């Protein structure tokens, strides 16, 4: 019998706010444990939450980016459960009236993955297990960090579709300016709801939820593993238990954590300390007008205006920084081909050599465009341009200023070039004679001698032209 895998995803993204959703504590990643906390996010008695307006605006922006309907009046609810990383013993979330509904993400195949809803909530803390002394430590810095939970419909049928959906969603949220979606820092986390059923069956099977997926590769492996596990249970006549499972990527397997809760288990009730969230039509229009160009539109424009291929576009779209760098560079240098080459080939090489990531690159986007113009005008050669570009990326150097200070400009004095070429001809009569006898390698040798005599500061085209004329 053939089986069909049915997959739905719950994706949590941390919103790009400077402070937490209900207090003024910073959201900065990587602080000393339990230093970004206050009585509000620790849930101490007598404290009251104050909603972060920026979190609401970013959530609306996310909904608009995914084509969602924006709920004009939404509400918060309390999700009650006990866990050591949840100081209040309840999480403020949205169940009954979420902020965004009915969006979608389109895969490359044209298949539409429906988004059921997006709702705001606060993050929990982080548990760190210490096997050496058998202790579990709690870091509450993450408590109260604003999250947007994006819940898909169970529209995906393979691990590949699920991973593509995650990639498309991450790209959309990053380019919309909603979240940095760094999985390694936990600002994008995905839970997988999965069941299997015989092909042609309408009724869904018993689902399990998979957690601890810290990469797209882990998500793909977990889906394939869980699908195979469930099919094996069915074929052996065993029942599938509705449960939450933890994925161990090193072992390539999952294990049961707890039975899967239903909504009723959390005893939701309306949050009494936060008034309804009202989003007016003018509010929505204002956010729409502030929206940047979204990935699908940007890809289409680059393809139509610049005739860029899919591979170049995919690489440029790997981060909002490189996409913005390309647009700014093309505006200055007017050559999409040159801009794409420098960003897709030279930039990664410089970053690797310096041990940097793209997030570490803080240079002005205008610098590359000006550097390409200096190269195309003959002011510098390509070797010099590469050296200058490395300084731009690693030290935010100004290209024109760096070239001037270090005397890297190419020689433009035709008389000086001619004098140097004449000296080389006089000193290399044998090579000149060989060239005149038809040995082209001798000409390349003479070019090299001329460039050496000029300290590498003359345009190769000018040296070649002068040598041909004088020989």
Question: Where are the model-predicted features located?
Answer:
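Basic, nucleic-acid-interacting segments
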Residues: 1-293, 304, 308-310, 331-335
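Amphipathic alpha-helical segments within well-ordered protein domains
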Residues: 299-303, 327-331, 348, 369-376, ...
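Core structural elements
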Residues: 186-198, 303-327, 336-354, 366-368, ...
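Amphipathic alpha-helical core segments of compact helical bundles
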Residues: 16, 193, 197, 228, ...
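Structural motif
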Residues: 1, 330-339, 377-380, 437-441
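Strongly charged, low-complexity linkers/loops
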Residues: 358-369, 373, 382-452
């Amino acid at each position: 019998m053939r089986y069909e895998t049915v997959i739905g995803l719950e994706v949590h993204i941390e919103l790009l706010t400077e402070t937490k959703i209900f207090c003024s504590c910073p959201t900065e990643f990587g602080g000393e444990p339990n230093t970004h906390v206050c009585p509000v996010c620790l849930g101490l008695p007598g404290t009251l939450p104050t909603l972060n307006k920026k979190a609401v605006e970013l959530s609306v922006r996310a909904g608009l980016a995914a084509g969602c309907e924006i709920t004009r009046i939404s509400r918060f609810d309390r999700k009650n459960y006990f866990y050591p990383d949840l100081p209040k013993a309840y999480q403020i979330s949205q169940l009954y009236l979420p902020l965004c509904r009915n969006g979608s993400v389109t895969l490359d195949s044209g298949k539409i993955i429906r988004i059921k809803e997006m709702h705001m909530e606060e993050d929990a803390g982080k548990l760190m297990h210490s096997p050496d002394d058998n202790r579990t430590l709690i870091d509450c810095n993450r408590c109260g960090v604003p999250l947007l939970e994006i819940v898909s419909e169970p529209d995906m049928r393979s691990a590949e579709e699920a991973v593509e959906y995650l990639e498309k969603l991450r790209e959309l949220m990053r380019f919309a300016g909603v979240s940095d979606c760094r999985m390694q820092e936990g600002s994008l986390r995905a839970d997988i709801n999965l069941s299997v059923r015989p092909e042609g069956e309408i009724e869904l099977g018993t689902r399990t939820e998979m957690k601890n997926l810290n990469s797209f590769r882990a998500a793909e492996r977990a889906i394939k593993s869980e699908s195979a596990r469930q099919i094996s249970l069915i074929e052996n006549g065993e029942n599938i238990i509705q449960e939450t499972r933890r994925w161990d990527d090193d072992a390539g397997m999952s294990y049961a954590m707890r039975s899967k809760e239903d909504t009723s288990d959390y005893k939701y009730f309306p949050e009494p300390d936060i008034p309804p969230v009202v989003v007016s039509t003018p509010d929505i229009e204002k956010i729409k007008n502030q929206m940047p160009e979204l990935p699908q539109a940007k890809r289409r424009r680059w393809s139509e205006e610049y005739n860029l291929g899919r591979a170049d576009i995919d690489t440029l779209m790997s981060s909002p920084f490189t996409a913005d760098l390309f647009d700014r560079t093309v505006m200055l240098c007017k050559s999409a081909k040159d801009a794409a080459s420098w960003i897709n080939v030279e930039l990664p090489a410089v970053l690797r050599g310096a041990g940097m990531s793209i997030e570490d690159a803080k240079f002005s986007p205008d610098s590359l465009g000006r550097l390409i113009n200096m190269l195309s005008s003959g002011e510098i050669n390509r070797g010099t341009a590469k050296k200058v570009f490395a300084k731009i990326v690693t030290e935010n150097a100004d290209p024109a200023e760096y070239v001037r200070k270090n005397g890297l400009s190419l020689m433009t004095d035709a008389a000086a070039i001619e004098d140097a070429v004449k000296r080389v001809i006089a000193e290399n009569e044998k090579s000149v004679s060989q060239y005149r006898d038809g040995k082209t390698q001798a000409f390349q040798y003479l070019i090299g001698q001329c460039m050496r005599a000029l300290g590498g500061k003359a345009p190769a085209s000018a040296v070649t032209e002068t040598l041909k004329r004088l020989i």
